[in-house]
């Protein structure tokens, strides 16, 4: 039986600490804290969890962590706020350039997208 936490099916054959990282917003350190609070061994595989353990983990995540859709929407709202107030970071987001001060002369391809080839100027004939 697949264990479903906040809309994500956890992989059955992985350790609990790793499996919880499949939820957006939970990393290794957060998953270790969650399992400690729930009293579940972090080396125990997900398929060996009892229903009570899974319910306790669900309860902890629901009460203390912002994950999945809520977290994604909060991040989007933060970026939208930056764009609306017109600050430097917001402008960089709006025009699709790196936000954190990286150089754009040669690199920044991830942010800028594929190269857009520009035609050369034709030489003037004498």
Swiss-Prot record:
It holds the Pfam family Ribosomal_S13. Residues 108-126 have a biased composition (Basic residues). The keyword rRNA-binding applies. GO terms for molecular function: rRNA binding; structural constituent of ribosome; tRNA binding. Signal peptide: none annotated. The keyword Ribosomal protein applies. Gene3D superfamilies: 1.10.8.50, 30s ribosomal protein s13, domain 2 (4.10.910.10). Keywords: Ribonucleoprotein, Ribosomal protein, RNA-binding, rRNA-binding, tRNA-binding. Residues 98-126 are annotated as: Disordered. InterPro entries: Rbsml_uS13_C, Ribosomal_uS13, Ribosomal_uS13-like_H2TH, Ribosomal_uS13_bac-type, Ribosomal_uS13_CS. It comes from the Bacteria. GO terms for cellular component: cytosol; small ribosomal subunit. GO terms for biological process: translation. Located at the top of the head of the 30S subunit, it contacts several helices of the 16S rRNA. In the 70S ribosome it contacts the 23S rRNA (bridge B1a) and protein L5 of the 50S subunit (bridge B1b), connecting the 2 subunits; these bridges are implicated in subunit movement. Contacts the tRNAs in the A and P-sites. HAMAP family: Ribosomal_uS13 (MF_01315). PANTHER family: 30S RIBOSOMAL PROTEIN S13/40S RIBOSOMAL PROTEIN S18 (PTHR10871), SMALL RIBOSOMAL SUBUNIT PROTEIN US13M (PTHR10871:SF1). NCBIfam families: uS13_bact. Belongs to the universal ribosomal protein uS13 family. Part of the 30S ribosomal subunit. Forms a loose heterodimer with protein S19. Forms two bridges to the 50S subunit in the 70S ribosome. This is Small ribosomal subunit protein uS13. The gene is rpsM.
